[in-house]
């Protein structure tokens, strides 16, 4: 397709054939270059006869990708020689299919034997962040932690102790690292009076908050297997081809279901993702942060052409038009009035209006509206990229309106407009007791809680459980997480706050590797990998099949590493709560106890020792496809939603109250309706005169956030690069592979450029999770996007707006 500036932004209808032709040469070049990877050599090992001393042990990849895949460790003489994946089941997603790990999980051996493994306890001897440590004994490390924790609780109270966000072992049971209230650290702290909790998460803070006011609670979605009943699939910023790419993830279901239904698939995203890769029917590029404007333009077409499902809106919804508008709301405060320009702003949300904001041609908006409205049923889904913006909460509510307006909620082949859902087994988790501290903050506001804790209030900063914080954070537990620095926004600000050890006086990091965050520890404890201990792995997003993995111990712990259960049990002994913490059980004892509890709810589970040999237990949803809100759709009176009205709330009275009472900075908007609001650092911000490019992030296939970010073969196979459109590159004299600088007022990153038509003009992208590697001037040399992101939170969730950034790019 021919693109001419300055109309490039409006040339947004991209055919699959045209894009594949454009990118074919680059793809062939990549396939034929001289990069040598040892995957082939390793795979041949599986074909050779197994030595007599070899044993195969079931293990798991427990990271935060949505899958949690089984791994089969081939162990010889106490060492892992190679890794395979699930060999049970078949290729048919109608049955108990195989759950095949991706290259990340299959490279687990390289994590276990990585040169940067933490070997023994250490204490800091330099400044935080310098990575200067000296070895100490376990006794000294645990004594130091226990005595400092007791001192800080005595001086500041339990509210001063914070459990930081960490998802490195999210899929574990005893080793589980998130949410904080479900971890062994939480159990230990609850035995000692509690801790300052957090709500929300870096993955989905805004969508969780926003759609709570639409559907009540966490917004569910149909399983991707149900796409076999769909005529059309529309994905807003949903990229399972990279975010959930293994056999336990969504890509497998998406493709197999579409083969049955022959459903068209349209991807709406600033970047042409691997979920497309020639499998989609159309890619529609869109400016980041403008999804709600597109939805408003689509809604205008649907309403004016009488394409909405009026009976559904009348029966199941609140606030679509004057008939269902709640008492006390403004007379023109309903959604239909907003779209038609009869609301307070007086602007009709026509396709022309939406086109100037989104960069999508008017004609394509009109066509898309008709396609969505007339496809019966349509599977409309949003990933978690669109919500990770300054206006993310309101954008998520807007995207869900497409499913609501067309009556696709609660039926086979439809969806709620949220991310895809899945079936899960009721497996018992580790009990963590009750937290006596009721106060919590947003997971994104912890640096502020260090810097200005007593100034933080409920109405201004989202403090929950009381009107304000009484004390700042004085101690941080950082278990299996890289959010002290690497995964938290505005790294340079976080560095300045953490480096002052008079503010937060004690930081304990528990990890397997010397991560970017580990360098900020006062006490650094070496954890065991999943291969070096026994646990259950679960919580996979796997369509209409769920499973539990027996992740057994394949090898002995390396060096002086201990399990998290050993560490916390030893600390409990020093703190005088050992009996309450352990209840007399070892790690295996807890596993046997939890397993027997689980068998009460899942009677088909085999006995413990049989399951240990079996390695994985799979079970299909007895209802067939998971259909979100099916019971509500069938009988809304008997099965109301958990919203105040019991219905889908297009107009939220609760949001109206929040909008009237919360203290918001200029530019932040909370509204009872799913309107379009640009948010800060938007495409039309005056700041674009200085920083003209929008920078967005994405989940890169070589890592799960930052996990696996230190594996050499994955880094070589999937190089960290900044994606930039040829139009923007040409203006700056940038060629593919050139070293460039990306910068704004928050920091600077040096990285190589990937010049590609797979990016929308005016937008650049960096895969999140690259390990922060600053030089002496604090210029990052690894492509860590959070050097450039902001710590200003989103309005409602107080979440991370990681994809809302303005930058400039120059060739070095």
What name fits each language-model region?
Residues 505-506, 553-572:
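Phosphate/diphosphate-binding loops
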Residues 331-452:
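Active-site phosphate/pyrophosphate-binding segments
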Residues 2-4, 180-268, 275, 293, ...:
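Extended redox/cofactor-interaction regions of prokaryotic respiratory oxidoreductases
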